[in-house]
Amino acid sequence: VKRSLPVVATLLAGSGFCALVYQTAWMRQFRLIFGASTFATAAVLAIFMGGLGLGSALLGRRADRHPNPLRFYGNLELLIALSAALSQPLLWLVGKVYIALGGSVTMGVFGATLVRLILATLVLAIPTILMGGTLPAAARAVTTSDDAGRRRLALLYGINTLGAVAGALASTFFMLETFGNRKTLIIAVLLNLLIAMIARAMTSGADVSSAPVEESSSALPARFVYASAAIAGFAFLLMELVWYRMLGPLLGGTTFTFGLILAMALLGIALGGTAYSLWSGGGGATVSGFALTCTLEAALLMLPYALGDRIAILANYLRVLGHSGFGGFLFGWTIITAIVVLPPAIIAGVQFPLLIALLGRGREEIGEHVGRAYAWNTLGAIAGSLAGGFGFLPLFSAPGCWLIAAMLLVALGLGAALYARNIPSIVIAACAVACAFALGPTALWRHSGIGAGRAETPQNPNEIRTWTNATRRMTVWDADGRESAVALADADDRSFIVNGKSDGAARGDAGTQVMGGLVGAMLHPNPRKALVIGLGTGSTAGWLGAVPSMERVNVVELEPVVLRVAQACTAVNHDVLHNPKVHISIGDAREVLLASRDRYDIVFSEPSNPYRAGIASLFTRDFYEAVRARLDRDGIFLQWVQAYGIDVETMRTIYATIGAVFPHVATWRTGEGDLLIVATREPVTYDLARLRQRAAAEPYRSALHATWRVESAEGFLAHFLAGDRLTRVVSHDALLNTDDQTPIEFGFARSLGDSSRFHMDQVIALAFGLGCAKPERMNGTIDWHAVLLQRAFEIDLTPVPSIAGADERVHHEFASLWDKSNFGGAMTVWTRNGRWMPVNSAEAAMVAESIVYSGAPDDPAPYLAMLRAWEPLEADVIEAAFRIRKGDRAAAIALLRRAFAGYRATAWPQPEIMGRGLALAKSVGAPAEMYAALEQPFAAAQLEELRLRTLYDLGRQIDHCGPRTLAALKRLEPWAPWQLELLQDRVNCYAQAGLHDLAAAAQNDLRDYQANMPEALAR
């Protein structure tokens, strides 16, 4: 037996490797069939884990009775390999059956969940039940009667889990990317067969029977041990969900992120099991030891909670390692994951073999003990997973569940400690409870965009507090939903944040969110039915629902909490939630497309970035084939693609994948850094008469002006970048993104630190070079020079000298200078080139502002009149500046009051212009009137931070430390802007007003600020 221990441990490591590869591949394949919702994932996970637990309980007892446990183990591995190989045709059959039944679209949530359970059982029951028996059989084969603490079992458990670590890392970081799902699973099957053959070859004759051994000295009833195993499993799986939810925003939310978290949790368990096996002393397990593991695990869980945002700040600083490439990012992620996950996972690894040792000594009934303990542990884990996903996370939030998991372990440990009269465990439990009173993770950790690379990098403690307070102050609310963590943030715009990354702003992203759908409606001859994938701010669905010919707009949204976002964005989305044409369903878009029988004129897909975990499945050839099947013959598919932070190979793969399904693929630009791929089965005819008619009719007229700041068919076509030919050229020899193999999921995530990026200018230059920069099929004539002039004021694009005419370069130079607030320079360009008439309202605003703010003698009236026809609030602000220049402050005050009142009703004026209006409010000489005009927020939280700071400045002008100053300061609490003058004002004003609690908090803040100021050279 002793001689076989190293070999059996090696075999069990391979078994753990295969099991994790199987689990990863199966979960990915089932998500493609059932969808990625929590309901679907939980059904599959419950069957997988349930099979393991049931197999452990049933086969553990049989392992004790088998004359040769090692042969029994080898037979199990052989059957696992065969049943895993059989899973592939079964998955194909399951997909056909589920789609034929109509999925959740037809069966509803309850019916679909029941069917998922049945179908998942068909595929997973046999292999998972067999897997559950491998550890009991191996333990029976190598454990000796003199092993009182069952340390050989612990070693096997640790080595088996170490193999699982290797499986998690290999599948996530190499196998799935290189081979795809099916080949990865086949490789695991072949390895499993090798393990089975080696195990069977090692066996000869019957196993040696064991001598009777004394009962465990734990004096604990077995039911307590099994209940403890269940509670520990519940707490650990609940905590795994918390780790995924909490670490995703810090590490980027990619497939690599979640694979790393899983591997780190398994590594901790492996190290803990191995450590237990090497524990000094030959005695058995004790209740005191178990109490110590529970309380220590709880304390180590709570330590990162108590550290709170300090861990987020560390994660932000570690992102600098990404400058060296993907390996640098991975190293930084590993540090953060190790800090949060590894210590409690190590203790959990000690805990499980200790529980089994409490049930008995040596090899007597070890198979049954392992089987039953594992079954109860797995049952608790299933309950923790289901409770966390369906109830606890949405109800208590991820930080709340963090506390619940730790307090469960504290309670379990205290119970055991009191039973064993173990004082150290009680002290450790008290430390864990004390950590619960810390502030814990805040919006800085969860919603500041650290993992997405959107966070600032502060250089000193006061800059850290500036960033910390601003992030917390701007977060209006956050919530943990079934699928994601969602937050609403008000800064310069109202934006929503999903799993740590901003997924859209009410006004700032309206060019894509509004026009992404309306481009299809403009081009389609008679749009009547549309499908929108992702609700977001509700803008796409709301504006499509406003199209007169549109009869129905179906929206599929995965996360129910996002409906709260749409409700908060009614100022920009045509009150989408109350539009009878718009029908919102909660579910997975893939499943809906595959299972429904509806047909559409327009399908618009704007998921999150494809490098984020699970999103790449909405960019696969299989998904696009499902879209094509749901489109009418002249239907239009619209795919948003980010043009920022993306590598060229990923962009080529996206083009190639769409082009493999749709023969006609055009490229549009909807906003800064946003591309729109317009894909059809038939070539699109651009009917200029129809385009002009629609550009002048609602809702197109308002949408074109509000989001793109154009007012004509020429302005609309200015956002067309390239036709079919570009797609064919770019797609040549590019990899395809398929359900089986998703290169953009892995390759894109790997390239995030790469300095060689794609830029939209590349599309423009290539389109001109290929001669496909204009639509190929046009009815009617158009002055393309006028189209290019409309594009010229898009300042984020760089006119390519070889393709841009002189006029375009001049207009672009003028717009660029205006964007930098260089109004004198802009005036020089404008006057030097003949004082041209603006091509649209946006350029009219630029000309008027340049005249007013540069002090030029030109009369802004003609340009203000042109602007006022489209955007009267902008005209009011610019005219107010002109009146101040002329000394007519009364007129300026009236204009500003009117502009601010109007800004509360509409979010569409340009923020740059309205921001200059807020600056005028402080200098116009009427602080009380301006204060009153700014007390209410603007529509969709436009310029909210600037408005609040302006109120404070105006309050100081009116009554320094008086009622209005106090009211303005309270609006900034409790996370006040970290600036010395304001911090001093808080102390003085609150003290004068007798607001002692606020004054004390303000004094502490001021003291912190001053303590972190640079020391003066001279004193």
Where are the predicted features?
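Alpha-helical transmembrane segments of multi-pass membrane proteins
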Residues: V1-Q693, F748, D754
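SAM/dcSAM-binding transferase cores
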Residues: L688-F793
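Alpha-helical segment of the N-proximal tetratricopeptide repeat
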Residues: I782-G825, E843-Y853
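Alpha-helical repeat scaffolds
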Residues: T798-I803, N822-R835, A856-A869, R889-G902, ...
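Generic helix N-cap/helix-start motif at coil->alpha-helix transitions
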Residues: I803-H812, W836-M846, W870-I878, A905-G917, ...
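Residue at a conserved register position within TPR or TPR-like alpha-solenoid repeats
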Residues: L817, I851, R883, A921-V924, ...
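Secondary-structure-rich domain cores
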Residues: W836-Y863, L867-I884, A891
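Terminal, low-structured helical/coil segments at or just beyond the last alpha-helical repeat
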Residues: W978, D985, C989-Q992, H996-R1019
